[in-house]
Amino acid sequence: MIKTLTILTALLLAPLATLHAADAPTPPAKPNILWIIMDDVGAELPCYGEKKIETPNMDRLVREGTRFDRAFLTASVCSPSRSALITGMYQTTIGAHHHRSGRGTEKIHLPAGVEPVPALFQRAGYYTCNGGYPAKGRGLGKTDYNFEWDAKIYDGNDWAGRKPGQPFFAQIQLWGGKNRNDDGRWYRDEAPKALGTLTQPEDVTLPPYYPRDPVLLADWAQYLDCIRLCDKQVGEILQRLETAGILDQTIIILMGDNGISHARGKQFLYDEGIRTPFIVRGPGVARGTVRNDLIEHIDMAATSLAWAGLPVPSRMQGRDVFAKDYQRRDAVFAARDRCDVTVDRIRCVRTERFKYIRNFHHLRPLLQPSGYKDAKPTVIRLRELHAQGKLSPLQEELLFSPTRPAEELYDVQADPFEIRNLAGDPQFRSTLETLRTRLDRWMAETRDPGPESEKAYDASYAYELKTAKSPERRNPMMKNYELMKQWAKEGK
């Protein structure tokens, strides 16, 4: 009887297995590969739980592909993140971890055996391109790599320039959250034309560490509308591929380069800064699937090479997340270092349940003076509310404490906003010690070089000062540079 039931069960399940296989057709030998990268966009998408907006085109990608729910960036600001992404390497391993480093007199060169991924595709016969949206003239889309590289790794800025039948490896850079610019011009003049109705600030839900203040509510509403614009652009890209008859020959990956630009988001290692959307659609990709395994954005490099049938360099730290022998990660790692002239060093390790953060400059406040962040309307308003004593005790503690904990530990399942630091709780001492050791091991194994040399820092400062044309940018930068030097002397 048991044998009969087993056979019957197998017969009943066989059609389902066949259907699943049909939903994920074998990719062509050399599929087109398209990375769509949204600037300053985190995981605040409807398919990840956001309730206030609709994104039908991104939802289509999810229905027709695979959504990764635990995808994380190894860096929380654009240039280290993009340097890591394009090489499949931790930015710390390749020395590209300081924001906009290598631009001055102190150049950064990739280690032996490490190349930008487009060069590997190009040698394999792919047409490589990187464009903004829409691509304009001959200019490339955003690169922002912190190392020396040859622009010839890109054949152009749009796959329209390829030979007939030539496969392409393309990147499309969406302006994303940067459309929420400081003077509000885009939102005032262009957003209504592009989107029609706009998200109402009073409808927005903020994380508990931000006050429900009109400035912050309006800013978050604009951010959600930036995501809606990205969705519209994704729809236009899909339509273009469909019209050309190549949608089903193209593997698409949608992700962000860092989280929302906000006080506790971009530049920091809380999930608001490093959790990224990661959606994949195309031949060989299971449809309507959700994966909960931990992945890092550097995995996109190895995975893309494998799709094209190209060997993954032995030194590459990213993994092919669709490989039959794929070893799931039990933890992911991230690093934050100098941003503009503001010196910092933070490292973290995150498992499915816990996140451990180490603040090397814990004697400094979270919101150090920063020319970039201090110009944001949200941070300006937060500083005003802090000065007026109008923030809650929680908001004061998390945003404006004069120092930071040397170590932070969060149960991200029970505390997704990372509010309750468990590092001093005896109940979690074993977890703290385990993750502390795990982070130490990762830093050693990946050869984390740590702080920037004073010579390199000064060279980066000189470059930043030269490119800052207005007194509004130069004066705070010079003031912050002197403060960083003073704090360094004081051992902060």
Task: Give the label of every model feature segment.
Residues 2-13, 19-408, 416-437, 451, ...:
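Formylglycine-dependent sulfatase
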Residues 451-465:
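Short, charged, surface-exposed hinge/linker loops at domain edges
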